[in-house]
Amino acid sequence: MRGLLASVALIFTATVAAAESPLFDAVATGNTAVVEQVLATGADVDSRARDQATPLINAALGAQLAIAELLIGKEADVMARNSGGFTPLHAAAFSGSVPISKLLLHHGATLDDAANKAGVTPLMVAGEENHVALATFLLAEGADVGHAEVHGYTPITRAIWKGNSDIVRLFKRHGAPCPPASRIGEKEYAKCMEIHD
């Protein structure tokens, strides 16, 4: 199961490597002017890579706020999903970008249906990557600290396994209990119980 924790990083690494169009290449430069030039040629703002990622997913993954704003201004789909079901909000969570997460939510992305095919939410990603500021923001926006993915693991479980004590503390403050030792292991349970405000 812990092998799945690395899956987010692998999926997003594949997304960046799977670029197949000039717009993906333009986003990869990080240069807004280059992205504008490519869009001016008629490039599809929601074009897809082999893994079904969109330019907006890649911009969010790279924490490229100006490019994300440009793509959204051209009506990029803020809830587009790659082949694993990851959205731009997942990508922003992976990069730890509070500004891009705010932008996405302001333009229609939702936390209610943001889970990917395995039930992984942006909050889980932020917790795994130890992005405390982003996890705090997502919780304030209504992210569910008790949401379980398909194997029954919650955000706190995944944060415990990653050793992210600040995230575990944050999740406990928001009502997440330590999972039972039978679920996460004696050592992990003891660590969780030791974490206090």
Range-by-range predicted roles:
Residues 19-54, 58:
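N-terminal segments that cap or nucleate solenoid repeat domains
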Residues 25-30, 58-64, 91-97, 125-131, ...:
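Ankyrin repeat A-helix N-terminal signature
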Residues 52, 85, 118-119, 152:
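Start-of-repeat signature of ankyrin repeats
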Residues 6-14:
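Bacterial N-terminal signal peptides
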Residues 31-39, 64-72, 97-106, 131-139, ...:
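Ankyrin repeat structural motif
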Residues 45, 78, 111-112, 145, ...:
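Ankyrin-repeat inter-repeat connecting loop/turn
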Residues 18-22, 141, 161, 165-197:
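Ankyrin-repeat-protein effector appendages
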Residues 49, 82, 115-116, 149, ...:
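Ankyrin repeat boundary/linker residues
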